[in-house]
Design a protein with these regions (language model features):
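N-terminal hydrophobic/helix-forming segments and targeting peptides
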Residues: 1-257
């Protein structure tokens, strides 16, 4: 029973981590919280590091990668675990809007990673990532998660798509998300979410994500299903393994990038 409870708690932590990590930037932020809560010391790349034996440290780069390591009491080799912070998805291109037939707007996206395209149809989607904005105190980067059902990639009725079963999907044609009507303004949306004026958005790096939450299922609750299991299950597991490791003779490294 104790082992079952431990497994259940770990599963719940994993699914909460994935739900809170709709983009690689959010995933790295959440991993940093896990590390800091466990007493790991944050290091900055532009500072001189003074390391002590027996302590654990971490540093980040670009907001999309995090490297954690422990300094052994007696060095006897190293052990490394690594994973990706990103997941297969659609990335919004710089020319973000496509007007179709003068009546509605689609997002101009491109495939990112090894995607199973058919799974993206007819489900609520939203956007997450980061924006670089201009503020009174200078230029800064802000994380964004538009936490609502924002867009969808619709499939057409069967009588409008004869032969579709044999059709090879083209992400640049068949899988452009429907954003809104003719008045939809992507740049205004990003500015609103970032809390700045439209002209103060310098750039943005946004990705689509499915709105469904992860679930436990099966006759004995033996399975889990969730968006972004590739590769956040590994990113979470790598971090947990690093934090729970007790080997004091190895240089332990967890690299999530």
């Amino acid at each position: 029973m104790t082992e079952m409870l431990k497994t259940s708690e770990t599963t719940e932590k994993l699914l909460k981590f994935i739900d809170a990590s709709p983009s690689c930037f959010h995933a790295v932020k959440n991993i940093c919280v896990m590390l800091e809560d466990a007493g790991c010391i944050r290091l900055l790349e532009n500072e001189t590091w003074t390391l002590e034996k027996g302590k654990r440290y971490f540093t980040t780069r670009n907001g999309s990668s995090v490297l954690a390591f422990s300094v052994p009491e007696n060095y006897n080799g190293m052990q490394i675990v690594s994973a990706h912070s990103d997941s297969p998805t659609f990335r919004v291109k710089s020319g973000a809007e496509i007007t179709v037939e003068g009546h509605y707007k689609k997002l101009n996206t491109e495939g990112y990673g090894g995607m199973i395209l058919s799974t993206w149809f007819d489900r609520p989607l939203s956007l997450a990532g980061r924006a670089v904005v201009r503020t009174e105190s200078g230029v800064k980067s802000v994380l964004l998660n538009i936490d609502r059902d924002l867009c969808i990639i619709p499939s057409l009725a069967i009588h409008m798509t004869r032969g579709m079963a044999d059709h090879k999907l083209n992400p640049q044609v068949d899988l452009l998300p429907l954003l809104g009507g003719e008045n939809a303004d992507y740049n205004a949306l990003i500015a609103e979410e970032a809390g700045v004026k439209k002209e103060d958005v310098i750039s943005s790096d946004m990705f689509l994500y499915p709105r469904q939450h992860g679930v436990v299922f099966g006759m004995e609750n033996e399975f889990i299903a969730s968006p972004r299991l590739d590769d956040l299950q590994c990113a979470f597991s790598a971090t947990e393994a690093f934090l729970n490791a007790e080997n004091k003779e190895k240089l332990l490294i967890s690299a999530v990038f």
